[in-house]
């Protein structure tokens, strides 16, 4: 079977030219050259989504136009008048199949146009790559796959009568109504046609991809024409599968895991080991920096109760012994902390250390005055919580020893008027050994609370204070608990002379500030349709009335977290 010979290309493929004689007897030659041929395209289909996923012909076709003028009898001497010629040019593109198809017996079904996009281009006069007129088609797409050609038709609109054809009738080229534009179709003339080389339109699965923009496209885009420029290769590789399409290679997995995983503390010697996170919320003592072999704090130990074995103990710094004071039992001298230490500067050990024991600090006697009582001092370095410094003597339970009593530091760090005036009764240290059994009678605890008062700066005769164990407080407290003045006056450990006053306000300030004291009459809440100008507001009890009312009624007494007793009016009575 003989093979069919390939079809000969049309005579006007890639290049085409035509000449005509003007009315003045000059010869004009038009020459079209397809400088950039279309190579590939992706079928966009004819459905509803075809316009959303439309791919242009790649690369965009570019057609060059040149106009020459010469004598009709001398074709060798031609002059390029492309820039000087006064006319408008349009190039219209159509699509045709590369191979002609035989016509069927039946009429074909009406179909939508295969070519879509912008098929018309105006001339652009550019200096590069050479001075000529260029037609660019950056937005041409084909709906169906196959092999096609682009057919370009040149149309001219003459502006001067001398440039019309030789046998054309004389018409007025001037517009009788300058304000109204003329219809250009009256002066459009078809000049010539040129076709491109065949190119293939692929389906979406077979499309090889878009190539980088050509140098001609870049040059045209640099001169202001609208051409899409692609700087990277977007060709699809066939045959072999890329190994980096999946995240299963070991290098990538290791690189991604190293950024977020915890470093191995048992790694190689050359690997730096980071300090592990601690469950403590206190600050770190700079005198004991963490090293590579630092132990992690046990996560099971509580911060305010039982504490496990500490990894190290803090030594006591040496300091001069204060002046001796006559006491019943001699106490070993304990140097105070350096002045630079403050209650907020603590080590990372939590409250209630059970492994280290330190004696109480021995302070020199100072005159008892109101200013002396309010002035704080720096106790020895304690292992209390950094955020909640303890302000009272710590409890002692059988089997454990706790640091001795410390003077409250909250009163010096906060203003006195910043908190509601509550009647606070700190427990008084008792002179009893740590191993002495305690009575289970609640009345004994009441007597201890009655004799509690503001501590003086003179040291007590006992080294370690003894307090009753933590127990659930009963609701029936005697009324004499709210009268610390009588109990304090009977206590031998307090010597209040004339002109001296208590550190705690024991007057008529048993509860929070009243609403009237804070906001006044106009800011009180209104109930049951009341108005601000009425006098039917329920008046609250005065301070004296509340004192009498509280003395005849039960008060709400509770023990604060630092160990001091506080009484407060019941919310139902306020």
Curated annotation (Swiss-Prot):
Compositional bias per record (Basic and acidic residues), positions renumbered to this chain: 513-525, 532-543
Disordered: annotated segments: 1-22, 39-60, 255-500, 513-548
Annotated stretches, region: PEST: 457-501
Residue spans of biased composition, Polar residues class: 343-359, 385-394, 402-415, 448-458
Motif (Nuclear localization signal): 39-44
Feature: compositional bias, Low complexity: 459-474, 482-493
Protein keywords: Cytoplasm, Nucleus, Sporulation, Transcription, Transcription regulation
Annotated GO biological process: sporulation resulting in formation of a cellular spore
Transmembrane segments: none
Biased composition (Pro residues): 314-323, 330-341
Phenotype on disruption: Blocks sclerotial formation, reduces conidiation both on the culture medium and on peanut seeds, and abolishes production of the visible orange aflatoxin intermediate versicolorin A. Fails to accumulate aflatoxisomes under aflatoxin-inducing conditions in the dark. Enhances accumulation of metabolites in branched chain amino acid catabolism and increases ethanol production.
Subcellular location: Nucleus; Cytoplasm
Cited InterPro entries: Velvet, Velvet_dom, Velvet_dom_sf
Coiled coil: none
UniProt entry tagged with the keyword Transferase: no
Entry text on domains: The C-terminal PEST domain is a region rich in proline, glutamic acid, serine and threonine residues that is required for the light-dependent regulation of development and secondary metabolism.
Family: Belongs to the velvet family. VeA subfamily.
Subunit: Component of the heterotrimeric velvet complex composed of laeA, veA and velB; VeA acting as a bridging protein between laeA and velB.
Protein name, UniProt field: Developmental and secondary metabolism regulator veA
């Amino acid at each position: 079977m003989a093979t069919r010979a390939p079809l000969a290309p049309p005579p006007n493929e890639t290049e085409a030219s035509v000449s005509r004689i003007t009315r003045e007897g000059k010869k004009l030659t038009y020459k079209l050259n397809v400088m950039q041929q279309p190579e590939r395209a992706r079928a966009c289909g004819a459905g509803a989504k075809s316009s959303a996923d439309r791919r242009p012909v790649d690369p965009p076709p570019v057609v060059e136009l040149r106009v020459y003028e010469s004598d009709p009898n001398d074709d060798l001497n031609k002059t390029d008048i492309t820039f000087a010629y006064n006319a408008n040019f349009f190039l219209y593109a159509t699509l045709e199949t590369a191979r002609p198809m035989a016509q069927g017996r039946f009429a074909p079904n009406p179909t939508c146009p295969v070519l879509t996009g912008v098929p018309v281009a105006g001339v652009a006069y550019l200096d590069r790559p050479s001075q000529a007129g260029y037609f660019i088609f950056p937005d041409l797409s084909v709906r169906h796959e196959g092999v096609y050609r682009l057919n370009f038709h040149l149309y001219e609109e003459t502006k001067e009568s001398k440039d019309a054809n030789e046998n054309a009738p004389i018409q007025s080229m001037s517009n009788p109504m300058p304000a109204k534009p003329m219809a250009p179709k009256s002066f459009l003339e078809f000049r010539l046609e040129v076709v491109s080389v065949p190119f293939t339109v692929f389906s979406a699965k077979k499309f090889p991809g878009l190539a980088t923009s050509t140098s001609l496209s870049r040059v045209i885009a640099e001169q202001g024409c609208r051409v899409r420029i692609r700087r990277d290769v977007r060709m699809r590789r066939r045959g072999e599968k890329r190994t980096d399409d999946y995240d299963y290679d070991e290098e990538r997995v290791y690189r991604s895991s190293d950024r977020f995983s915890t470093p191995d503390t048992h790694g190689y010697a050359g690997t730096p080991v980071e300090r592990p996170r601690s469950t403590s919320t206190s600050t770190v003592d700079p005198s004991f920096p963490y090293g590579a072999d630092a132990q992690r704090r046990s996560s099971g130990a509580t911060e305010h109760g039982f504490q496990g074995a500490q990894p190290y103990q803090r030594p006591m710094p040496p300091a001069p012994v204060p002046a001796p004071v006559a006491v019943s039992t001699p106490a070993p001298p304990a140097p105070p902390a350096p002045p630079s230490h403050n209650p907020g500067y603590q080590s990372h050990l939590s409250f209630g250390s059970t492994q280290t024991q330190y004696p109480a600090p021995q302070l020199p006697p100072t005159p008892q005055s109101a200013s002396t009582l309010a002035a704080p001092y720096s106790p020895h370095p304690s292992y209390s919580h950094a955020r909640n410094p303890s302000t009272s003597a710590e409890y002692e339970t059988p089997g454990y020893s706790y640091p001795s009593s410390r003077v409250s530091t909250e009163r010096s760090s906060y203003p006195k008027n910043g908190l509601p005036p509550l009647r606070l009764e700190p427990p008084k240290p008792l002179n009893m050994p740590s191993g002495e059994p305690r009575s289970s009678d609640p009345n004994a605890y009441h007597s201890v609370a009655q004799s509690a008062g503001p501590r003086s700066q003179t040291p007590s005769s006992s080294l370690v204070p003894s307090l009753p164990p933590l127990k659930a407080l009963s609701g029936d407290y005697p009324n004499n608990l709210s009268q610390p003045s009588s109990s304090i006056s009977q206590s031998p450990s307090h010597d209040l002379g004339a002109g001296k006053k208590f550190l705690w306000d024991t007057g008529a300030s048993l509860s929070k500030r009243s609403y009237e004291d804070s906001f006044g009459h106009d800011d009180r809440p209104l109930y049951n349709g009341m108005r601000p100008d009425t006098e039917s507001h329920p008046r609250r009890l005065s301070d004296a009335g509340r004192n009498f009312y509280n003395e005849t009624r039960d008060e709400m007494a509770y023990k604060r977290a630092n160990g001091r007793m506080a009484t407060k009016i019941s919310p139902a009575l306020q």
